[in-house]
């Protein structure tokens, strides 16, 4: 043990030694090479790679183990056209029996429910109060509706999350018969498991590359989104059945029930039409068999619940009515929460693979069905926006961010597929932020569309009117035109003024008229990049004729860091101070300053030159303005004509001794001309022959023995 420790210390000491052949002789070039070659300042490429690596690590930590395993990556790499075999999706479902795919969302939802605690009895009374408000808006007048109790609370958060997360139901016996109540509880438990399987299917069906289209994934998304529309039709029928039962209880003499929305379609007809003429049923593809089986399982549970609601006998009195209302809200909340998962997951990232991306007709129909259902049943069922949902779910948004960042770093520019989606989103956000929606997309009373034509005709008309013109693919190292358009709009004052968060002088514009909806429309402002190639003081236009943004750029406020508080008096301009000449009376210094100024004038941009931030028109021209390639780093040559020749020994990386693949202290082979003869040096007395030779391999054992002997002699001399 002592010998092993002594040997390890000797090796650590030998690792820090400098070879003797570098100590003797004239080696003037070695320090420069060690300084500039050993400089560890990060490069822009290294910083971008580190940022993408951090995104990837954060994403991998948030994913289930199966999504990041090697076996899945190998099987996806063997596929063509960015497809995912359904057998791989089924393996993902089998590998996640405890629903790890939704653990972040479940944790955040449980924490939110814990912060707003509400007992079961109080929650049931609050749900009943909300139901009375809803019933007064959908049935004709003359119905004796109970008055709202004083001091009621808002149960929206618990209605949205509790039925899906809590294992126990609020209304455990909504039917008179105990056997029927037990069948109801078993059906709800089976429905929860079936909904989880569809959500797992959607979670694990993502391809490896979000920057390319995927035919199989587009077909599966169409099936899922069409299935969402079917869910909301079933939910409307369930609520209509409950309303009819409650109205008969409140007014037994009036046997006619005429709701404002009319009688919905029976669930059996809706389900049969979807299974026969749905997206996966009409294409004949074999890559949606497991998805169709999972959808059929869910529809079977919903059919059993519909039969219980239609034929089951309810308890009489007030408690029977309360249990009927609460159980209906619970079941519909579970289905509504499941539909929100599919829609919000599509908006968070899966929409990149959908047919026509965000203009997908099934996505439009699903969102339209959800919004119509929420408006008709208000204030019973709240809706979670996609940003709020993504902050709770975490994993899907992190995965798409890391995957798209890696592709952008690898290719230098977004792909054609990804860029077309970004342009579509930017164009539609500009349209909606400028004013109210067009007539064919406006909503009439009750959530129905006011424009004429079918849903497909509306989607095609909106797509034809608002789709941007096709643009050529951008070249590498180019500047997006969206930023230039934003600056052009800010400089010219065209269009609605956008707020500037960093400008304390600008006044906030008046709020634009927003459509009446339950969804939060995020009016994001494109980020402003720092100004580059700013002209010198002699080439700036008069400040009075420049817009506000140009005046701020001329003052250098976009280049220097923001200083909080008043600026010190008499501080010179940063850009002008850069070009000040020396205050020396020496002719040589003045001549050098004049030469530097003339060189800058030769290389300075002229008024006629195109700037990389030059604005372009909206007539379908080039979106990207090419930036000339410039080298960031120049090779530094520090040797002068009279300097000593460079040493032929070049340092290389080695994981152990920093000396390449050769033996200990043995330099690499000579690649240049032979070195000049070294000056003779006195031969020093050596303790052991051939222990430290200048050329040839070194004996590690001899070196260890030498160091041990020197250590012992040092102790004796003390």
UniProtKB/Swiss-Prot annotation:
<keyword id="KW-0920">Virion tegument</keyword>
<keyword id="KW-0805">Transcription regulation</keyword>
<keyword id="KW-1090">Inhibition of host innate immune response by virus</keyword>
<keyword id="KW-0804">Transcription</keyword>
<dbReference type="GO" id="GO:0016020">
    <property type="term" value="C:membrane"/>
</dbReference>
<keyword id="KW-1032">Host cell membrane</keyword>
<comment type="function">
    <text>Plays a role in the activation of the host PI3K/AKT pathway to promote cell survival. Interacts with and activates host LCK and thereby recruits downstream partners SHC1, GRB2 and PI3KR1 in order to activate the PI3K pathway by phosphorylating host AKT on its activating residues. This mechanism is inhibited by the viral protein US3 that instead promotes incorporation of UL46 into virions. Plays a role in the inhibition of TMEM173/STING-mediated type I interferon production. Interacts with host DOK2 and induces its degradation.</text>
</comment>
<keyword id="KW-0597">Phosphoprotein</keyword>
<keyword id="KW-0945">Host-virus interaction</keyword>
<keyword id="KW-0899">Viral immunoevasion</keyword>
<comment type="similarity">
    <text>Belongs to the herpesviridae HHV-1 VP11/12 protein family.</text>
</comment>
<dbReference type="GO" id="GO:0030430">
    <property type="term" value="C:host cell cytoplasm"/>
</dbReference>
<feature type="compositionally biased region" description="Gly residues">
    <location>
        <begin position="444"/>
        <end position="454"/>
    </location>
</feature>
<keyword id="KW-0946">Virion</keyword>
<feature type="compositionally biased region" description="Basic and acidic residues">
    <location>
        <begin position="455"/>
        <end position="467"/>
    </location>
</feature>
<dbReference type="GO" id="GO:0019033">
    <property type="term" value="C:viral tegument"/>
</dbReference>
<dbReference type="GO" id="GO:0052170">
    <property type="term" value="P:symbiont-mediated suppression of host innate immune response"/>
</dbReference>
<feature type="region of interest" description="Disordered">
    <location>
        <begin position="433"/>
        <end position="510"/>
    </location>
</feature>
<dbReference type="GO" id="GO:0020002">
    <property type="term" value="C:host cell plasma membrane"/>
</dbReference>
<dbReference type="InterPro" id="IPR005051">
    <property type="entry name" value="Herpes_UL46"/>
</dbReference>
<comment type="subunit">
    <text>Interacts with VP16. Interacts with host LCK, PIK3R1, SHC1 AND GRB2; these interactions promote the activation of the PI3K/AKT pathway. Interacts with host YWHAB. Interacts with ICP0; this interaction targets UL46 for degradation by the proteasome. Interacts (via N-terminus) with host TMEM173. Interacts (via C-terminus) with host TBK1. Interacts with host DOK2.</text>
</comment>
<keyword id="KW-1043">Host membrane</keyword>
<keyword id="KW-0472">Membrane</keyword>
<keyword id="KW-0010">Activator</keyword>
<dbReference type="GO" id="GO:0006355">
    <property type="term" value="P:regulation of DNA-templated transcription"/>
</dbReference>
<protein>
    <recommendedName>
        <fullName>Tegument protein UL46</fullName>
    </recommendedName>
</protein>
<feature type="region of interest" description="Disordered">
    <location>
        <begin position="581"/>
        <end position="611"/>
    </location>
</feature>
<keyword id="KW-1035">Host cytoplasm</keyword>
<dbReference type="Pfam" id="PF03387">
    <property type="entry name" value="Herpes_UL46"/>
</dbReference>
């Amino acid at each position: 043990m002592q010998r092993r420790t002594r040997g390890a210390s000797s090796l650590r000491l030998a690792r820090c030694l400098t070879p003797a052949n570098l100590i003797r002789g004239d080696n003037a070039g070695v320090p420069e090479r060690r300084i500039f070659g050993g400089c560890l300042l990060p490069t822009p490429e290294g910083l971008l790679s580190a940022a993408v690596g951090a995104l990837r690590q954060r994403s991998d930590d948030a994913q289930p183990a199966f999504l990041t395993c090697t076996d899945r990556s190998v099987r996806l790499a063997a596929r063509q056209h960015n497809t995912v075999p359904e057998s791989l999706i089924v393996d993902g479902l089998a590998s996640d029996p405890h629903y790890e795919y939704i653990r972040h969302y479940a944790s955040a939802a449980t924490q939110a429910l814990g912060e707003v605690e509400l007992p079961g009895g109080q929650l049931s009374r609050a749900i009943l109060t909300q139901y009375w408000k809803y019933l007064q808006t959908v049935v004709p007048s003359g119905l004796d509706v109970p008055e709202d109790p004083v001091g009621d609370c808002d149960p929206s958060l618990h209605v949205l999350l509790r039925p899906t997360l809590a294992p126990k139901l609020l209304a455990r016996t909504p039917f008179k018969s105990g056997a029927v109540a037990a069948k109801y509880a078993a059906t709800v438990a089976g429905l929860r498991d079936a909904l989880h399987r569809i959500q797992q299917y959607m979670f694990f069906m993502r391809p490896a590359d979000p920057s390319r289209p995927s035919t199989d994934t587009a077909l599966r998304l169409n099936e899922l989104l069409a299935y969402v529309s079917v869910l909301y039709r079933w939910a409307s029928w369930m609520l209509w059945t409950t309303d009819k039962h409650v109205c008969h209880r409140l007014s037994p003499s009036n046997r006619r029930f005429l709701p404002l929305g009319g009688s919905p379609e029976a669930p059996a007809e809706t389900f049969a039409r979807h299974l026969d003429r749905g997206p996966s049923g009409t294409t004949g593809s074999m890559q949606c068999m497991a998805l169709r089986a999972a959808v059929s399982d869910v529809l079977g549970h919903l059919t059993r619940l519909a039969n219980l609601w239609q034929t089951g006998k309810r308890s009489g009195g007030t408690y029977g009515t309360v249990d009927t209302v609460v159980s209906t809200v619970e079941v519909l909340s579970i289905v509504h929460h499941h539909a929100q998962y599919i829609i919000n997951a599509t908006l968070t990232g899966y929409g990149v693979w959908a047919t026509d991306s965000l203009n997908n007709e099934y996505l439009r129909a699903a969102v339209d069905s959800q919004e119509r259902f929420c408006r008709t049943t208000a204030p019973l069922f709240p809706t979670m926006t996609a940003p709020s949902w993504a902050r709770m779910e975490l994993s899907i948004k992190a995965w798409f961010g890391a995957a798209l960042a890696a592709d952008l770093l690898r290719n230098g520019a977004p792909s054609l597929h990804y860029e077309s989606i970004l342009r579509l989103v930017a164009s539609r956000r500009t349209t909606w932020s400028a004013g109210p929606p067009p007539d064919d997309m406006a909503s009439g009373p009750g959530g129905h569309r006011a424009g004429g034509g079918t849903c497909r005709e509306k989607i095609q008309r909106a797509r034809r009117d608002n789709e941007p013109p096709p643009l050529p693919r951008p070249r590498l190292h180019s500047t997006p035109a969206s930023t230039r358009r934003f600056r052009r709009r800010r400089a010219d004052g065209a269009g609605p003024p956008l707020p500037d968060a960093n400008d304390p002088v600008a006044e906030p514009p008046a709020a634009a008229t927003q459509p009446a909806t339950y969804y939060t429309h995020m009016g994001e402002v494109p980020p402003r990049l720092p100004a580059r190639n700013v002209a010198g003081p002699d080439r700036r236009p008069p400040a009075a004729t420049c817009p506000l943004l140009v005046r701020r750029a001329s003052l250098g406020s976009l280049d220097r860091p923001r200083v909080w508080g008043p600026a010190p008096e008499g501080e010179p301009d940063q850009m002008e101070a850069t070009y000040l000449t020396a205050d020396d009376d020496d002719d040589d210094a003045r001549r050098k300053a004049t030469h530097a100024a003339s060189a800058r004038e030769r290389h300075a941009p002229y008024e006629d030159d195109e700037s990389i931030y030059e604005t372009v028109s909206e007539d379908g021209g080039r979106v990207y303005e090419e930036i000339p390639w410039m080298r960031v780093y120049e090779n530094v040559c520090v040797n002068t004509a009279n300097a000593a020749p460079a040493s032929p020994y070049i340092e290389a990386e080695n994981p152990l001794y920093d000396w390449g693949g050769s033996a200990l202290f043995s330099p690499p082979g000579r690649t240049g001309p032979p070195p000049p003869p070294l000056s003779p040096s006195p031969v020093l007395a050596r303790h052991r022959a051939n222990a430290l030779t200048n050329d040839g391999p070194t004996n590690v054992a001899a070196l260890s023995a030498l160091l041990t002997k020197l250590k012992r002699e040092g102790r004796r001399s003390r």
